[in-house]
Amino acid sequence: MTFAAPMSSKEARQMIRNNEWVKPTAGVANGYTQANLVVLPKELAFEFLLFCQRNPKPCPVLDVTEPGSWEPSMVAPGADLRVDLPKYRVYRNGELTEERTDIIDLWDKDMVGFLLGCSFTFEHALVNNGIPVRHIQENCNVPMYKTNIPCVKAGRFEGPMVVSMRPIPHKDVVRAVQVTSRFPSVHGAPIHIGDPKLIGIHDIYKPDFGDPVTIREGETPVFWACGVTPQAVAMEVKPDIMITHAPGHMFITDLRDEQLGVL
């Protein structure tokens, strides 16, 4: 099944809730802000919120639920974070133990949900500026990589920054920086342009998360901070349980992309 266009955020979430869409959400419900998900027990919530505050590039906070509540009331009233994402990951003691399409049985009265800004949000703006987005063109997930850039520690939370990569034609790199800089609450400007080895990526065609994409002659790899960073942190910190979105399978909010733009 494919999404019809145009589609509202609520319509997209309903299809996802009905398991009619279990694929990555890049290009889905264009114009609506997408978000990364992290779910943790209440006892870890403050430390993780502090981690996000100290690392706003990879972890820009859009909403935080009340303990036990699965409704992100600020960005999508009435939504249910237990069922409204296409695919979830469950980490136990730092190990990825399963992927599933709902987390109803895992969300108890102590769970707190965090929604973090996602770079899929500014892809609509890139396309509107005539800048190609390769993983959308190739109908796959965006490539994501662990880097040698350390995040600022907060309590128990520490680990490497994860970045997403999009190949950009040389002539459009400056424009891509300008366009994405307008969206600081969804990662904003790139954190690196060019040689991936400088940030600890040794094989650009072997991403740690997502899928490899074609890099054509005349294109430069451009890297943005990525909301998959908490998953890399989970592998380092090893909390008893951390639930996240599966990379590329995002939560679609009711916010419009341009609501998060500046200038």
Curated annotation (Swiss-Prot):
Disulfide bonds: none annotated. GO terms for molecular function: lyase activity. Pfam families: D-Glu_cyclase (PF07286). Keywords: Lyase. This is Putative hydro-lyase GK2103. InterPro entries: D-Glu_cyclase (IPR009906), Putative_hydro-lyase (IPR038021), UPF0317 (IPR016938). Belongs to the D-glutamate cyclase family. Its EC number is 4.2.1.-. It is an enzyme of class 4 (lyase). The lineage of its organism: Bacteria, Bacillati, Bacillota, Bacilli, Bacillales.
